[in-house]
UniProtKB/Swiss-Prot annotation:
Record keywords, A-Z: Apoptosis, Host cytoplasm, Host membrane, Host mitochondrion, Host mitochondrion inner membrane, Host nucleus, Host-virus interaction, Inhibition of host innate immune response by virus, Inhibition of host MAVS by virus, Inhibition of host RLR pathway by virus, Membrane, Modulation of host cell apoptosis by virus, Viral immunoevasion
Gene label: PB1
Protein name as catalogued: Protein PB1-F2
GO cellular component: host cell cytosol; host cell mitochondrial inner membrane; host cell nucleus; membrane
InterPro entries in the record: Flu_proapoptotic_PB1-F2 (IPR021045)
Region (Disordered): 1-34
Membrane as UniProt keyword: yes
Length: 90
């Protein structure tokens, strides 16, 4: 294989994000992002409301010691519905 040739792995994990700041452009290219870098990037590009919902979700995930898939789904859905209800009231 030639050096510099894209493999299916690099094609699927490369992520290019272009953000405009002021009059210039900044290009950020993440190759083989680990989960922390990917999550940081995701939180940077989300809206404030979306970011708050994601933080609430991750706090719930981390607060569970040994979650089963069913218990996790039930708990997160309950909190999500409650949060959305409060958002409509406010």
């Amino acid at each position: 294989m030639e050096q510099g040739q894209d493999t299916p792995w690099t094609q699927s994990t490369e992520h290019t994000n272009i953000q405009k700041r002021g009059s210039g452009q900044q290009t950020q290219r993440l190759e083989h992002p680990n989960s922390t870098r990917l999550m940081d990037h995701y939180l940077r590009i989300m809206s404030p409301v979306g970011m708050h919902k994601q933080i609430v979700y991750w706090k719930q995930w981390l607060s569970l010691k040994n979650p089963t898939q069913g218990s996790l789904k039930t708990r997160v859905l309950k909190q999500w519905k409650l949060f959305n209800k409060q958002e409509w009231i406010n």
